[in-house]
Regions:
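Conserved AMP-binding/adenylate-forming
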Residues: 1-42, 252-377, 382-386, 393, 399-400
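Conserved pre-ATP/AMP-binding loop-to-beta segment of ANL
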Residues: 105-125, 131-132, 137, 165-175
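AMP-binding/adenylate-forming catalytic core of the ANL superfamily
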Residues: 42, 48, 59-61, 219, ...
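Conserved AMP-binding/adenylation subdomain of ANL enzymes
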Residues: 144-177, 182-225
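Adenylate-forming
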Residues: 16, 61-70, 88-89, 179, ...
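ATP-dependent adenylate-forming carboxylate-activation enzymes
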Residues: 15-16, 33-51, 63-68, 198-218, ...
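Structural core segment of the AMP-binding/adenylate-forming
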Residues: 30-105, 115
Length: 432
């Protein structure tokens, strides 16, 4: 197989957060099928594109999403099995679909004879950084190390199942992964928690972000680590604490990734919850976790700077050389080592994103950075065509093309502006 090809069957997870999402994920890996994330906010056209691009064989979906599944199933010829998870919405099982709980209750005991391999695939669909969503495909052994807890607290790679078991026996953390599991920020922290023997907590309202619900869940379930996605998640939580001040005595760490958390918001959160650390975790679907930075009441709040870590590099504009500290201008933030093998069925984009420089293979998803004299990385955001809005990556050219389909639009330019809530928001100048 080439780097952009898969030899396994693919299972779509069209689900809100819940135990079924994580159960189905693990079950797919056990059966040597490849689960992949589906944005539950997609409209029919987007869903059809994604499912066909992924060559989906099985779709697991919540019953409240069944009408959309019914609308698009005939447009996805590879789809051969539907599994419906009951979320107490009204309606009957789709024709030919199987009920999730019934499958569990009637399953045979024991495990089938399956030969698992380190290069079995993990796949995560991008939110649009690459234009239309694409499936970044990894070897499971690489993803485990890159983002799912395959390293010790000292940063060394865990080499044996026994080491995982011994660590899990000591696991005690209680994680609330507030982002949707269909977002890497949500599913990665949940799987990392499970791999370390810790507990995954899920808030009551999983269809929208409710700051009070997040705070109350942290208090009730004694959460000590909360995952958020930048200001889009952090600000409603801060607002909830301002409206109704209350301590969260168990909370020690707020982990934020996928979008910028501004220094102003960090300062506010540290004033409201002075005992916590705010951990910036930078990375992408194409790199895993690349770097971390900690803010707390002792060191203050900063945003946008990270220490260069093992496997990180800054590449020149033409992607032919590694830049040294103190270089002129901006470079591309790159990651080597445990990185994806490519994008599903996209030879051209695989070649563009995964480059070899001086014999080392790098993933270069598009972040612009400057490596300062002291080896500090200063982030300058994605390239100008990509907009990060609340953790969702929006390709400006794709939005322009969609708007130009409207018969009254003569020309359009799409860009972004700063937003207190979303980090960036999409704006357009339209000529009619």
């Amino acid at each position: 197989l080439e780097d952009w090809q898969s030899g396994q069957d693919h299972v779509g997870l069209y689900l809100y957060n819940g135990n079924e999402y994580l159960e189905a994920t693990v079950a797919c890996y056990k059966s040597r099928t490849v689960p992949f994330n589906i944005n539950f906010r997609y409209v029919d056209e987007e869903l059809i594109y994604l499912l066909n691009n992924a060559h989906v064989k099985v779709l697991i979906y919540h019953s409240s999403l069944s009408e959309r599944v019914m609308n698009i199933r005939s447009e996805v010829p590879s789809l051969s099995l539907l599994i419906e998870v009951d979320d107490e919405s009204k309606g009957t099982l789709l024709d030919g679909a199987l009920a999730y709980e019934e499958i569990l209750c009637t399953a045979k005991n024991g495990f089938p004879a399956i030969d698992h391999k380190p290069d079995d695939l993990y796949m995560i669909y991008t939110g649009g950084t690459t234009g239309m969503p694409k499936g970044a495909i990894w070897r499971q052994v690489d993803m485990l190390v890159a983002a799912l807890g395959g390293k010790t607290s000292k940063g060394t790679v865990i080499e044996s199942l026994q080491e995982f078991q011994e660590r899990a026996m000591r696991g005690y953390h209680r994680y609330l992964a507030s982002p949707p599991f269909m977002h890497g920020a949500g599913s990665w922290v949940a799987l990392k928690a499970l791999h370390s023997g810790s507990t995954v907590i899920i808030q009551n309202d999983v269809r929208r972000l409710d700051g009070d619900d997040i705070v109350d869940t942290c208090i009730r379930e004694k959460v000590d680590a909360l995952m958020i996605v930048g200001d889009a998640f952090g600000r409603p939580i801060a607002d909830a604490l301002v409206r109704k001040p209350r301590p969260i005595p168990s909370l020690r760490n707020i982990i934020t990734g996928g979008a910028v958390t501004t220094a102003n918001l960090k300062t506010q959160l540290l004033e409201l919850l002075p005992e916590i650390n705010i951990i910036d975790a930078a990375g992408s679907s194409e790199t895993g976790t690349q770097a971390q930075h900690v803010s707390n009441a002792l060191v203050g709040a900063k945003t946008g700077k990270f220490t260069l870590q093992r496997g990180n590099a800054v590449l020149s504009d033409d992607l032919t050389s590694v830049l040294e500290p103190g270089h002129d201008g901006l470079g591309w933030w790159a990651q080597s080592g445990h990185i994806p093998i490519g994008y599903l069925d996209d030879k051209e984009k695989t070649a563009e994103t995964f480059v070899t420089v001086d014999g080392t293979r790098y993933s270069v998803p598009g972040d612009r950075v400057c490596l300062l004299e002291d080896n500090t990385l200063e982030l300058h955001g994605r390239d100008s065509m990509t907009i990060n809005s609340g953790g969702e990556k929006i390709f400006a050219e794709e939005v322009e093309q969609a708007l130009k389909h409207h018969p009254d639009v003569y020309d359009v330019v799409v860009t972004s502006r700063s937003s207190d809530r979303w980090g960036q928001e999409v704006i357009a100048v339209i000529q009619l």
